[in-house]
Design a protein with these regions (language model features):
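Short glycine-enriched, charge-decorated loop/helix-capping segments at active-site entrances
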Residues: 178-185
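Short, glycine/acidic-rich beta->alpha junctions
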Residues: 14, 189-190
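Helix-loop module immediately N-terminal to the HCX5R catalytic loop
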Residues: 1
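SAM-dependent nucleic-acid methyltransferase catalytic core
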Residues: 4-7, 48-164, 168-178, 190
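Conserved S-adenosyl-L-methionine
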Residues: 4-63
Length: 192
């Protein structure tokens, strides 16, 4: 895949997710987007050049007493009730590492609803977070939280630019149907 992408002037990823592909692309400019506001807010706080303490504060939730089903449910409720994007971003890291299989799923009311994961010793991914931070701090970037068909994501693109589309996947069966990456979900019609 990377040889096909090459070294674009601008690299646009409308379904950024973990940014795994972008972290392996050498572009001059990155436009990263995801419909999940919690994810994009996390990235914005993580790469804020004026705040070196974000990762450390995320670690405040990674205490042995918080690796417990009741504490998890309590912190998940706190996350769902909070409107403070900074606090939600810190808790989002905790939820991702303590929930079942690291899933991100929301109910129709917009509440994060993944159950407790029973991990033995979930760790703060501080090295990966620092690597992500340094990668994007050293490059021109935009992180957006808009619908994938929003024209602003693609404004000014031309020769030498790449748009990488890796949308959520069509379920293999009715029981595998999962498209609740954000409150509004992602329908089959949007995928095709």
């Amino acid at each position: 895949l990377l040889p096909l992408i090459g070294t674009p002037k601008t690299y646009v990823e409308p379904f950024a997710g973990s940014c795994a592909t972008a972290l392996n692309v050498d572009a001059k400019r990155y436009v990263m987007n995801d419909i999940n506001a919690d994810l994009i807010n996390l990235y914005k706080y993580l790469i804020n050049p004026n705040d070196d303490s974000f990762i450390q504060h995320c670690g405040d939730f990674f205490r042995p007493e918080n690796n417990d089903k009741e504490e998890y449910i309590s912190l998940r409720k706190y996350f769902n009730d909070s409107t403070d994007t900074l606090e939600r971003s810190r808790l989002f890291v905790y939820l991702n590492r303590h929930c079942f299989n690291g899933l991100t799923r929301y109910n129709s009311g917009g509440g994060f609803n993944v159950p407790f994961g029973k991990m033995k010793n979930p760790m703060l991914p501080s090295t990966a977070m620092m690597d992500f931070r340094m990668y994007f701090l050293m490059r021109k970037h935009i992180f957006a939280n808009v619908h994938f068909d929003d024209g602003r994501l693609y404004a000014g693109l031309g020769s030498g630019d790449v748009v990488y589309l890796d949308p959520p996947y069509v379920p293999a069966s009715d029981t595998a149907n999962f498209a609740s990456y954000a409150k509004q979900g992602f329908s089959y019609d949007e995928q095709v």
